[in-house]
């Protein structure tokens, strides 16, 4: 496993790699959202069923537009989202037709977040698009909180580790349905 700086993982991700990186609250695992092979590998590493869906994190809202159907959200709904971004709020939004089921799972919606974490911002800016993001753990286990835990859980299974500080949040992001406004987590 290569320990990398955020600006050094672009090629790894573009070539289908899976990387670990700090987020607002825990370490995450991520890959290219347009590479089904990489997503399948990520799901296998986590032992996570594809039906649950995944989260996309982005450096700005524009990066999410190829994946979400903005036309199905009102200006009022979008404004409630924009007030919370960038930050530790993940919103469930309608998907564009043809989106990979590996991203949205068995749903017709997708969890998305514009992150304020500098590492995620840097990765997504380099990629020019969002990153698949899920907590760095095997399904049912607590998420990794340090580089040491990443190495213990995933050594030899991921392609790069970006070390860095976690954000100030004590728990993973709040998840809100963008249409109903209902808090789901």
From Swiss-Prot:
EC number: 2.7.7.87
UniProt entry keywords in alphabetical sequence: ATP-binding, Cytoplasm, Nucleotide-binding, Nucleotidyltransferase, Transferase, tRNA processing
Sequence intervals crossing the membrane: none
Main location: cytoplasm
PROSITE patterns on file: YRDC
GO CC, alphabetical: cytoplasm
Subcellular location: Cytoplasm
Domain of life: Bacteria
A biological-process GO annotation: regulation of translational fidelity
Gene Ontology MF terms in the entry: ATP binding; double-stranded RNA binding; L-threonylcarbamoyladenylate synthase; tRNA binding
Residue span(s) of domain YrdC-like: 3-185
Swiss-Prot/TrEMBL catalytic activity: L-threonine + hydrogencarbonate + ATP = L-threonylcarbamoyladenylate + diphosphate + H2O
Annotated InterPro entries: DHBP_synth_RibB-like_a/b_dom (IPR017945), Sua5-like_dom (IPR006070), TC-AMP_synthase (IPR023535), TC-AMP_synthase_SUA5 (IPR050156)
Stated role: Required for the formation of a threonylcarbamoyl group on adenosine at position 37 (t(6)A37) in tRNAs that read codons beginning with adenine. Catalyzes the conversion of L-threonine, HCO(3)(-)/CO(2) and ATP to give threonylcarbamoyl-AMP (TC-AMP) as the acyladenylate intermediate, with the release of diphosphate.
Family: Belongs to the SUA5 family. TsaC subfamily.
Database matches in PANTHER family: SUA5, THREONYLCARBAMOYL-AMP SYNTHASE
NCBIfam families: L-threonylcarbamoyladenylate synthase
Name recorded for this polypeptide: Threonylcarbamoyl-AMP synthase
Gene name, Swiss-Prot/TrEMBL: tsaC
